[in-house]
Amino acid sequence: MPVLVVNVDHVATLRQQRKGKEPDPLTAAHLVELAGARGIIVHLREDRRHIQDHDVELMARTLKTRLHLEMAATEEMQAIALARQPYMVCLVPEKREELTTEGGLAVAGREAFLKDYLAPIHARGILSSLFIEADEAQVRAAAAIGCPYIELHTGHFADAPTRAAQRAERDKIVRAIGLARSLGLGVNLGHGLNYDNIYEFADVPGISEFSIGHSIVARAVFTGFERAVADMAAIIARFPA
């Protein structure tokens, strides 16, 4: 069955509003672990708007579960990944003006660059993933460079204005999952998933992980992290492998 990995960036966002020490995303990460999530995600952005370098360092040293590091494909981030050695790195596009990651990484046409970029990361035994749109060309390009995983962007599905539009976006994702699996790729889903819309994937086989952050942190404000994570993990536990 698929597993839950939880993004704690929004805890760091709240901390950075006051440039203080609280709330601590490391504490949130440990609570997420205790609640049964299989991994923690942090996005170390180039502008350091939420997660900071010391957060990654502390999590890499102390977490018992998997640390997933989201990052742009820059020399600086490559060096950090090699130094901290997370379980997985996920390459994502970044724009300074965006509130959150707005779309998938352009892989098609950049295969040679990305393959070379990931080579030293793979050599250290670190898994990699590419955050991409549910698009055939992007899926095939990801497979061509030898990346073991992709994460399909579910934001268009989550933000669809009508039920029909949502179903159309879901169908694109399901087709992309099937293609990726046929090419030997592991498939993760993430962006905009919540306690309601995640059921749209309850009958879809071939998903390895669900990457969820905002909706869990939002619920945790009222229920606490352990309850919020446990509720989502219980939903996913009923999904097929």
UniProtKB/Swiss-Prot annotation:
This enzyme catalyses:
3-amino-2-oxopropyl phosphate + 1-deoxy-D-xylulose 5-phosphate = pyridoxine 5'-phosphate + phosphate + 2 H2O + H(+)
What GO biological process terms are annotated to this protein in UniProt?
A: pyridoxine biosynthetic process
Keywords tagged on the record = Cytoplasm, Pyridoxine biosynthesis, Transferase
Residues at which 3-amino-2-oxopropyl phosphate binds = N7, R18, G192, G213, H214
Q: Where does 1-deoxy-D-xylulose 5-phosphate bind?
A: D9, H10, R45, H50, T100
Describe which pathway this protein belongs to, using the record's wording: Cofactor biosynthesis; pyridoxine 5'-phosphate biosynthesis; pyridoxine 5'-phosphate from D-erythrose 4-phosphate: step 5/5
Q: Where is this site: Transition state stabilizer?
A: E151
Q: How does it assemble?
A: Homooctamer; tetramer of dimers.
The record's section on NCBIfam families has: pdxJ, PRK05265.1-3, PRK05265.1-5
Q: What does this protein do?
A: Catalyzes the complicated ring closure reaction between the two acyclic compounds 1-deoxy-D-xylulose-5-phosphate (DXP) and 3-amino-2-oxopropyl phosphate (1-amino-acetone-3-phosphate or AAP) to form pyridoxine 5'-phosphate (PNP) and inorganic phosphate.
Q: Which HAMAP family match?
A: PdxJ (MF_00279)
- State the protein's name: Pyridoxine 5'-phosphate synthase
Natural source organism: Nitratidesulfovibrio vulgaris (strain DSM 19637 / Miyazaki F) (Desulfovibrio vulgaris)
**UniProt gene name:** pdxJ
